[in-house]
Each structure stands twice: as C-alpha cells, then as structure tokens.
Amino acid sequence: IDGYVDNELFIDEDLYLEYIDKYGKPEAGDVMVTGVGTLGVCYVVKQEDRFYFKDGNILWFKQKAKDRILPEYLVKAFDSKDVKEFIDKNSSGTTVGTFTIQTAKKMEISLPSIEEQRNIIQKITKIESVIKQRRQELQLLDDLIKARFVELFGDAIHNDKGWETDTVEKLCKEIYGGGTPSKSHPEYYEDGDIPWVSSKDMKTDVLTDSQIKINQLGVDNSTAHMVPINSVIMVIRSGILKHTLPVAINAVPITVNQDLKVFIPNERVLTRFLSVQFKMHEKDILSGVRAVTADNIEFNSLKQRELIVPPIELQQEYVTFLEQIDKSKVAVQKALDETQLLFDSLMQEYFG
C-alpha cells in the first residue's frame, strides 16, 4: 500500500525458513506485482524486508539483469497507460481479473540505457511529487471547509448547537433521478450539446461538463430530465460509495443518469449549504450503503435524514466563506491539471 508491504497475516519462523530453503526469497531490488484484484500494483523489495507471499496473488520479478533495468524504472513502466491497458486487455477471469506469469512474459516495455533510466526516474518522480503536493493542498482546503462548518454550526449529525432540524425531503422543492436515452437510438446522442452526467463525471464540486452528451431528442424520449442550474447532485449507486460520497452543484443546465439524484432546495436552505451538509454526513450515509447488484444508498432513508437548518443569514455567511475558498481551489486545481498533463505527456513519451 503506497509503496509499503501491509503485513496483515503472519507465519512462524520455521515455516518462513522452510519456504526460503525450498523456493528462495525476494531480494532487495526485486519487484513484487499484484496479480489478482487490483492488478499491476508494484512494490520494490528493500534490504531490511522479511516477508513471504501467497503464490498466484503476487508476481515476483527477480532482479537478474541489474545492468539492464532498474527496479524503479520497471515500477514507472507499470504506471504507464500502455502497460495498464495491456494488463486490462490480457487479464483473465470473469469477476476477478488475474495478471498471470504467462501474460507478464509477453509484456513489452522500452529499455533505454541505465543512465537514461535514472534520468527518466528522476524526472517522473519530481513531477509525481508536485502532483502529490497539489492534491494535499486541495485536501487542506477541503478540511478548512469542514472546520469552518463545525466552527459555525457544530456537529451536523448530533446537532450539539440545537439548531432547528428537518428532513431532506422537506428541505427540497424537488428530488428526482435521471435516466439513460436508449443506446439503440444513436440519434439521441448525435451532435449532443447537453451534458449527461454519470458517476464518472462527479469528480469536482462544480459540474460544467460531462464525458457523454445528449441532444434534445434524447431528453424528450427518456427520463433524463433537464436539471436547472444550482441544483445539488449526488451519486446514489456506484462502486465509489464503498469509500466516497460524490456530491456536486451544477453551474450549467445538465441531465443525469439513473445512478444520480437531483436535489432542488427550497427557500429554507442554500444550495451550497445543503451540498456541504451532505458531505458532513458522508461517513454516516456510507455506513448504510447496501451491496446488491451494485453499491447503493437506500433512497427513502436518505430522504428522511434529519439536517440542521440554521438561520439563512448564517448560512449565507458560510457560503461567502466558501466562495473565497473556491478561488484558491480553482488556482490549485489549474496548477494540478497542468502538472498532470505534463506527467501524462512524459509517460507517453517514455513508455508509449
């Protein structure tokens, strides 16, 4: 995990020595790669490491040609788009993909000189460090948003400041879901200029676009209703609900698919305040996520969830604070996007 071995299971010393005697053991500089579940995650063995592994779940790349390839270079190669696509395309298994030794042997990567590999590693590592820093800055701003909320309003779930409360349903003029125009009618998507938002698009706090767009014909012939500007959008069915509750506000008119819900607040609650309050309830909401055919939120329960309703003037004070934070987030996000673009370009140049 994050470049470290997470030891959850242990074997005794005698068994460890028996395995080493029979099969050898990973040495410093060898690369271990996940072969089941999340594929292609790498770990470079360190000098002080003492561990063994479950054969079949982990691929062991022994460092036999130290004069030809650096272990860190191999790790960077596994992070490249081309190698990831190769693994995805060639992974076997219906529900759980597997990356096998046979597949690994067919994998090809460019192999420059050791000196050039060192230069590539240095450049990529430096850019990765900048990307990590930018993401940390965004996280700090998100933490500041939550801290200011608690400062003004207290605990949103336990309501320790004794605010008036009401249900999500009663704080909204409308709550509705979306739909998918039939894919068997390509004319619903031709020259589409209306964003059709899915969980894949819910990566920012403010929605302005989507990967797929539909046209008015698609809207008229489906349940993908037009969503007015300044509505709250939430993902209620997706694997991402295992760990994150995506919530956003749309800055342009959009449509959404059936995995999302739209909340149009009434005059008692401001849109931004409602959006942040959902995020303050994130852990509690996700604790009730059910996995049936897909991870999903029990919607009737969500509609009956009690939210705090402070005076609108205090909500506005908080929203004004958010607008100042937004300016900082936009600047950091722009820097992150530019750095990510440079990273992607270099990875394609070196490993494409």
Which role fits each region the language model picked out?
Residues N7-L9, K89-S91, K161-T165, P181-Y188, ...:
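Short coil/turn segments at secondary-structure boundaries
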Residues I20, Q47, K132, K183, ...:
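Short, solvent-exposed loop/turn positions at domain surfaces
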Residues D21-D79, S198, N215-K279, E298:
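A short beta-sheet element
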Residues G35, F51-L59, I69-E72, S91-E115, ...:
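A short glycine-rich beta-alpha junction/loop motif
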Residues V83-F86, H281-I285:
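Periplasmic-binding protein-like
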